[in-house]
Each structure stands twice: as structure tokens, then as C-alpha cells.
């Protein structure tokens, strides 16, 4: 099958040849899979076209967790009646997908966004988490399930004392209908199989382009001074105004949490807006998102964690072959959200070098 046909048929002409990386790998059960994985930071980030299984043609498309974007002007005109913002858990994105051969599922494979098969480091973490009945759900519904692997054992930058090593369902892709699942479908799956879901933190109501924060979870609200926010009178005339307000709310919560608990509470919130914008919208506290003061160390650390998630057990061998592999990887990922001049600045490079020398845990 030609690469152009793959791009047109499976990636909706939204990627280019340079965005697809060819792979041939052996799974944990010894199956050989060959195909292409997408590295473009859009809705197809990490998605794969598997061309061959065990050296035989067996075409199948696996949708990954889409790139989660900040607010931008391209979505300003979107009108919606409801937006539910869930907690943005700070961990590793894990995707479970079915591998088919001759019409039968022969293996359910976990991966991270940028890998075909999860690294041994991730497999070892998953052994410490409750993964049942994920494999059974994938097989029964012909579905790709997406989780956040988070908790004290997989702590990145946000301390989460409520979990040791847990999986929370954050997305799903129905292979049968070729569609990313809605919040209601995710909630139904979670309820039926007692899967964890991220906390629902902020509920927004909309009407004809106007938006109002209808409710805030007690998880956040207990840290807010009630006289500084009135949920019934905050009417926003645009998504831009709404997201700016949410940033301030999250910043205030984090400051109060730090004063009381000694640590910040949240990295931000995420809304599943597949129907409205064809993807996910994230909002982070002001102190995390601000770019004009340089790239926050927390953002650089997140990309370093991703590097470990993807290459963990292979880092030493990679470094011997390419000493700049780590820096190039982190810079490439940072460039998706930050201006290239800031990414290439000496300040950013110094932070990356300092973090590289830090212990993994």
C-alpha cells in the first residue's frame, strides 16, 4: 500500500510523509508488527497504521490520544451549550489497543503516545496498577482505551497524595464507528466497569456564544474565597474570556493549596470537545502557562518525563550513539507550545541540562 494512500485513507490528508515514521517491532507476546506511526502534534499524534502482522498483510488503524491544545483564536467562533472540564492529571498517557490477525484479536498492547509498544519502564509501572478488566473491554467493544498513569509512584511535577499508581480513563476511540468517544460514553464505561475517571472540576453552560460557570467542584471551591467569585454573575462573551477566568481560578486554588498544604493542587483542566473542535482543550494556571517570562521549569520537566516514558530502558544505548538525542527530543516537543526563540534560548538549554542530571525519581 502506498504511503499516499495511507495518508489519504487513514489520516484524512492531515499529515505529510515526513510526519510518518516507519517501524517494525516485536510485541511482548512475540508478534511482529510493521507500519507507520504519526509524530505530528495534531489529532493524529501517536496514531498508527499497522500494515503487516507476523510478515503478513493485515492493515489496521489505531487512533492514539490526540494532542491537547491550549485555547487559540481558531476556536473562538465555536458555540456550545455545555463544557465539562476534568482534572488534568500529571502522569503518563497510556493507550491500550487491539492487535488483529485474520479477524481475531491476538494481543492487547499498551503504548505511550510516541511509541508503538510501551517501554519496559512503563510495563513495570503497569504491574503495580490495577489494569483489569482493560484487556477484556478492548476486545469486547473493539475499542482503543486511553488512560493517564499517575500517582506517587509515577509522580511527574504535581504531587498527588491520593493515588499510589493508578489509571484514569481519559479517552477512547471506537474502531467500529471510527470516532473518538464522548464524555457520556467514557462515563458509562467507567461506571459499568468501575474504572477511574479524572475529577469533574468545572461545569460551564453556554447559550448563543455566551458562557457562564455553572458550578465548581468542592475539590477546588474549598480553596476559593467566596466573596471573590460569584458563579451566578460571571457571564463571559467569548471562550477567550472564559479560559482567562479559569486560569485565574486555578491560580488562586494553587496558591491557597500551597499556603495550606505545602504543595500546589492541580496542573490544570481539560475538556473533551470532540464534537465542537475535534479535539481536547486544556487550561492551565497562569503561573504555569505564562510564556513571556521563559518556559516554566515544570513544562521542561514534563517533556523530560515523556522522554523517559518513551525511551526509559534504552537511554544509555541511545546516548552512546547520539549525545544530542535527549536535547533534540525535548526541544522539538517544547516547540509545539512555545516560540522557537525561547526554546532555543541559553536559559532553556541550561535548565534542560540541569534536569538531565537529576535522578529519575
PLM region spans:
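Core nucleotide-handling region used for phosphoryl-transfer chemistry
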Residues: 1-361
Amino acid at each position: 500500500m502506498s504511503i499516499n494512500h495511507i495518508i489519504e485513507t487513514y489520516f484524512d490528508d492531515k499529515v505529510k510523509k515526513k510526519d510518518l515514521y516507519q517501524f517494525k517491532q516485536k510485541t511482548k507476546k512475540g508478534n511482529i508488527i510493521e507500519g507507520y506511526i504519526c509524530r505530528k502534534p495534531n489529532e493524529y499524534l501517536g496514531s498508527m497504521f499497522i500494515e503487516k502482522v507476523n510478515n503478513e498483510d493485515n492493515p489496521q488503524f489505531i487512533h492514539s490520544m490526540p494532542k491537547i491544545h491550549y485555547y487559540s483564536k481558531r476556536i473562538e467562533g465555536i458555540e456550545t451549550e455545555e463544557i465539562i472540564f476534568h482534572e488534568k492529571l500529571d502522569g503518563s498517557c497510556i493507550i491500550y489497543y487491539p492487535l488483529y490477525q485474520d479477524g481475531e484479536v491476538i494481543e492487547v498492547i499498551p503504548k505511550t503516545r510516541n511509541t508503538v509498544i510501551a517501554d519496559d519502564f512503563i510495563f513495570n509501572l503497569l504491574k503495580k496498577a490495577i489494569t483489569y478488566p482493560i484487556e477484556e473491554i478492548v476486545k469486547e467493544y473493539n475499542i482503543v482505551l486511553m488512560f493517564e498513569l499517575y500517582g506517587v509512584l509515577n509522580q511527574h511535577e504535581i504531587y498527588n497524595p491520593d493515588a499510589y499508581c493508578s489509571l484514569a480513563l481519559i479517552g477512547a476511540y471506537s474502531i467500529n464507528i471510527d470516532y473518538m468517544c464522548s464524555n457520556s460514553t467514557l462515563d458509562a464505561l467507567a461506571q459499568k466497569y468501575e474504572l477511574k475517571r479524572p475529577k469533574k472540576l468545572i461545569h460551564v453552560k453556554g447559550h448563543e456564544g455566551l458562557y457562564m460557570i455553572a458550578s465548581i467542584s468542592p475539590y477546588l471551591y474549598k480553596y476559593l474565597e467566596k466573596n471573590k467569585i460569584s458563579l451566578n454573575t460571571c457571564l463571559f462573551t467569548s471562550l477567550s474570556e472564559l479560559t482567562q477566568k479559569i486560569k485565574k481560578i486555578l491560580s488562586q486554588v494553587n496558591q491557597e493549596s500551597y499556603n495550606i498544604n505545602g504543595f500546589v493542587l492541580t496542573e490544570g483542566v481539560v475538556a473533551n470537545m470532540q464534537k465542537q473542535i475535534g479535539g481536547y482543550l486544556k487550561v492551565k494556571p497562569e503561573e504555569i502557562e505564562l510564556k513571556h517570562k521563559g518556559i516554566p521549569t515544570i513544562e521542561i520537566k514534563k517533556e523530560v518525563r515523556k522522554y523517559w516514558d518513551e525511551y526509559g530502558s534504552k537511554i544509555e544505548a541511545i546516548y552512546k550513539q547520539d549525545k544530542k538525542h535527549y536535547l533534540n527530543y525535548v526541544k522539538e516537543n517544547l516547540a509545539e507550545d512555545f516560540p522557537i526563540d525561547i526554546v532555543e534560548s541559553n536559559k532553556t538549554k541550561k535548565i534542560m541540562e540541569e534536569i538531565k542530571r537529576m535522578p529519575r525519581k
